[in-house]
Design a protein with these regions (language model features):
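N-terminal pre-Walker A segment at the start of P-loop NTPase domains
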Residues: 267-277
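Short, surface-exposed secondary-structure boundary micro-motifs
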Residues: 65, 116-117, 235, 568, ...
Length: 691
């Protein structure tokens, strides 16, 4: 049998060209990819819950008889179906429904449903449940194993993903998926066989310890996390070694431009900015490529340090490229750098995906012709982008870019021979205990001081039952001339459903706040649409912005002083901290309301309590590491510090010492296993030798 890493998903039944394209969107190109695409969480559909025992926020299978189905004309037309089982009654609410669907819900119909119970206008409600009619006297069987919920994308249902996993699991074996951890190593570190771990995680038995799985502490997760962290460690060592052998332009410490820049800035850099600025200046003056990470809390002034680094290269006559992960953020950097550099006589060019036709050609010509400062998005990675003499690359939010993209920029250095220096900025604080393991290939600087004028944000926890009070608070803030964000984080495994939730919230708030100008921004809108809405919000034409978490990185609207975050219990603390950093940028006192769905677990309450107690990102990251709440510890994997499939740096911190030892042993005794591991876990793994 072929190795599954070489078998395309098109070998699976039901996967044609169109489905293969959808699968590629979530990184699934081979059967090995499918098997390593692990569930985000599990649903227990192995038992039927009496309707009378349902609690708000609970996912459950229920069975009952329809007592009525009516089309209700509220803010949105919906179908409301009443379902009872003798212990209680629940309402099923459908916003998108057909006449046939309405007809199938006649009084007396016996239904089995699955969904999340939520408080609604008619008591407990389940929005858009999965359901089927039950006929005959025989009770329909329930599921035998826990039901996996996978990360997905538009047009790719959970049902379809489960079928594809089922087919792939049927082909799983030691020949089709070799175990690259030598037996002796696996024995020393008490690691289970690879195929056992994968089978278990796709189909945990009904009696599996759900809490242990939610925590990520199960032996099967432990096995895969260990292998992934081991591979990451090996790749970092290769990166470091290859970097030491490369040359970069040595840039003398600049005098003239930084002096003018700081004089125009209007405020003195903080002590932390000066210290980190010196570290960067020293690195740039060396003939080896700098590879430095600046960690700075939200609002700590990383961009000013980046500008000082840029001026050192610019004064020496070289080009600088600054790259951001989204067009909104890149455009913000472009505006800032234009404002700062053009008075110094330094030209700034712009390149993003939305730039088309003549404007794009003109921009490419400027870059090739040597325009000193270039700001853009991923578009800067493309082959057709040629620099004249690039000496420094500044990357904002490193975790959004893969290793192959870093490679592409490396190759754009001076004359293609020298390697540009790289300065990477992140506002995702890494606990100090993990920084060394997270970025073994980078030198790290920390900006641990906020510039004067930043006001701490007051954070409060409010239960969803008080939603109307929160809406009134938004109305009052807007009436005072302030602006507000309302962030929807409803459903973590599906961008499509989260966007629908945002649309529903937008309609509800527009209706409730008739006189307030409300905008909507979510991940499925085109970049141009997002940029237009963002610009309106920034200019004050919109007072309230309903958004999904697309706004978490770097958006700067100083007049916004109120943020509402729905379902904060579903997000990692680092991500909540990023979102909260969008307010408190002006002089007004700012507030963040965490609108949660009770009941909160004890750890959930503790975690959200940390957000209330502190505005310090590093403290928050350390506390997150200590708590690791069950099912709620969304650490660095999801917030994007490093794109791990299984491992989570915070959760798996205790594995790191053993992982380092195992990496050493593998390099010394089984070096032939290193490349297959890199290929398995890191796309383009073979290129690690050249990064």
């Amino acid at each position: 049998m072929s190795e599954l890493s070489r078998v395309s998903v098109t070998a699976l039944k039901g996967v044609g060209e169109a489905m293969a394209e959808k699968l590629a969107k979530v990184g699934l190109e081979t059967l090995q990819d499918v098997l390593f695409h692990l569930p985000l969480r599990y649903q227990d559909r192995t038992r039927i819950v009496p309707i009378g025992a349902l609690r708000p926020g609970q996912d459950a299978v229920i069975e009952g008889v329809v007592s009525g189905a009516d089309v209700v004309m509220g803010k949105r037309r919906s179908l409301l179906v009443r379902l009872g089982d003798g212990t209680g009654v629940v309402s099923l609410r459908f916003y998108h429904f057909s006449n046939a669907q309405k007809e199938s819900m006649k009084r007396g119909t016996h239904l089995r449903c699955f969904g999340e119970a939520r408080p609604g206008a008619s008591g407990l409600e389940i929005y858009h449940p999965e359901y089927r009619a039950i006929t005959g006297d025989e009770p329909a069987p329930v599921e035998q194993t826990l039901t996996p919920i996978y990360p997905t994308t538009e047009g790719l249902t959970q049902q379809r993903l489960r079928q594809l996993c089922q087919q792939s699991l049927a082909m799983l074996g030691p020949e089709s998926l070799p175990d690259w951890l030598p037996e002796e190593l696996a024995r020393d570190y008490q690691l289970a066989p690879l195929d056992d771990a994968i089978r278990y995680l796709h189909h945990p038995p009904a009696d599996a310890d759900v809490e242990e799985l939610a925590l990520g502490h199960h032996w099967a997760q432990h096995r895969l996390a260990f292998e992934e962290l081991l591979t990451h460690q090996l790749s970092q060592q290769r990166l470091r070694e290859s970097l030491r052998s490369q040359r970069a332009p040595a840039l003398p410490v600049a005098k003239k431009l930084p002096k003018q820049f700081l004089a125009n800035l209007g405020f003195a850099p903080t002590g932390a900015q000066q210290r980190v600025g010196k570290e960067v200046a020293y690195d740039l003056s060396q003939p080896e490529p700098m590879l430095r990470l600046i960690q700075g809390d939200v609002g700590s002034g990383k961009t000013v340090v980046a500008a000082l680094a840029a001026l050192q290269a610019l004064e020496a006559g070289y080009q600088v490229a600054l790259m951001a992960p989204t067009e909104i953020l890149a455009e913000q950097h472009y505006i800032n750098f234009q404002r700062w550099l053009e008075p110094l006589g330094v030209g700034v060019a712009w390149l993003a995906g939305k730039l088309k036709g003549k404007a794009r050609v003109a921009s490419l010509e400027q870059i090739a012709g040597g325009t000193p400062m270039v700001v853009g998005t991923h578009a800067l990675f493309q082959d057709e982008v040629q620099f004249k003499n690039l000496a420094l690359v500044i990357i904002d939010e490193q975790h959004r870019f893969g290793v192959q993209q870093r490679l592409a920029l490396r190759k754009k250095g001076v004359g293609g021979l020298m390697c540009p220096h790289q300065l990477i900025m992140t506002a995702t604080p890494i606990p100090r205990t993990l920084a060394m393991s997270a970025y073994a290939d980078l030198d790290t600087s920390i900006l641990d001081e906020l510039p004067p004028g930043r006001t701490p944000v007051n954070t409060v926890l409010v239960a969803d039952s008080r939603r109307l009070e929160v809406v009134e608070r938004v109305r009052a803030a807007c009436a005072e001339g302030r602006q507000a964000y309302w962030v929807c984080t409803l459903i973590e495994e599906s961008e499509e459903l989260t966007c629908k939730a945002a649309e529903t919230t937008y309609e509800e708030l527009s209706s409730a706040l008739g006189d307030v100008r409300v905008g909507l921004i979510h991940g499925r809108m085109k970049p141009a649409e997002k940029a237009a809405i963002m610009a309106e919000f920034k200019q004050g034409a919109l007072q309230l912005l309903v958004a999904t978490t697309v706004i978490e990185v770097g958006v700067d609207v100083p007049n916004s002083s109120l943020m509402i975050i729905e379902n904060p219990e579903r997000l990692g603390l680092a991500q909540l901290h990023q979102l909260r950093g969008r307010v408190g940028r002006g002089s007004a006192v700012s507030h963040c309301v965490l609108l949660y769905h009770p009941p909160l677990s004890q750890i959930g309450r503790q975690r959200l309590g940390i957000m209330r107690e502190t505005n310090d990102g590093f403290v928050i990251a350390e506390k997150d590491l200590e708590l690791r709440g069950p099912g709620e510890m969304l650490g660095t994997r999801q917030t994007g510090l490093l794109q791990f499939k299984v491992a989570d740096l915070m959760r798996d911190a205790d594995l790191l010492p053993a992982v380092r030892d195992a990496a050493q042993a593998l390099l010394e005794r089984w070096p032939q296993h290193v490349s297959p591991l890199l290929d398995r876990w890191l796309r383009h793994g073979q290129q690690y030798g050249q990064v």
